[in-house]
Amino acid sequence: MGLLGCRLRVYWLQTYWDARRGARAPHPPNERLTVTEKLKIGVLLSGSGTNLQAIIDQTANGLAVEVVKVISSRPDAYGIERARAAGIPVTSLNRAVYADPEAADAQIVTELQAAGAQYVVMAGYMRKVTPVMLNAFPNRVLNLHPALLPSFKGAHAIADAFAAGVKVTGVTVHFANEDYDKGPIVAQEPVRVAEDDTLETLETHIHQVEHELYPRVLGWIAAGRVSVDDAGHVHVAPEGGAAAQDKAASACTVGTHQGHYTLRRHVGTLR
């Protein structure tokens, strides 16, 4: 359908139509049924895929997200096995064939669009994305960085923060743009550096926060709570706020054969 948070309003006085089962059931007066389509994402990775696994695990716990494609920049990345175990289609790009970054991104865009991905989620992806991808998914390419941007950019952020002796570091989720590690920030979570922390224990703490924060942000996006203004600043509406309600109220045609919906009931006055 291409729309998120689509609402099916059912105006029967005493019954509603169960969109999943095609069966009628008692329906309290003045109640409306909301059908929310899952957010379809493509995940890019280069390594073990622990953040991919965290997302997969949270979808089993009700996160309204569907991973429709995984693309790896390395054929030996363990994240490929995680995707296959979850039944997710996987592509591994051959660096010899796609040595040119723009050619690689053009192929990635083709595969993600064919899979129906609405957002691109970088999860330990070690290649910089090009304008080819950014233009195909404007403000829809997410990146996870293991530090509080704009501090400690680059591939060794945790080690750099530890070496600098900071007392607080953290995790940032941001939209990617053409400036490396500098796109609009969606969310940040601080991590305190304890006196007895080693680099290894700090890495463990950072990764634990990553695995919680990334799915949470995806849940915000799926609920229609995230927007980017003209100045490039990200705003997250309160849960159930106006932005989320407007998104949920967007009318659409619901095809029950797709089977990718989260059902919620909202009590209110039918108009």
Where are the model-predicted features located?
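N-terminal Rossmann-like dinucleotide-binding module
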Residues: 35-78, 82
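Short, surface-exposed acidic-centric catalytic microdomains
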Residues: 63-107
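Structured binding elements
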Residues: 120
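Short, low-complexity intrinsically disordered segments enriched in A/P/G/S/L with frequent Arg
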Residues: 23-28
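Donor/substrate-binding cores of folate-linked one-carbon enzymes
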Residues: 58, 65, 73, 123-235
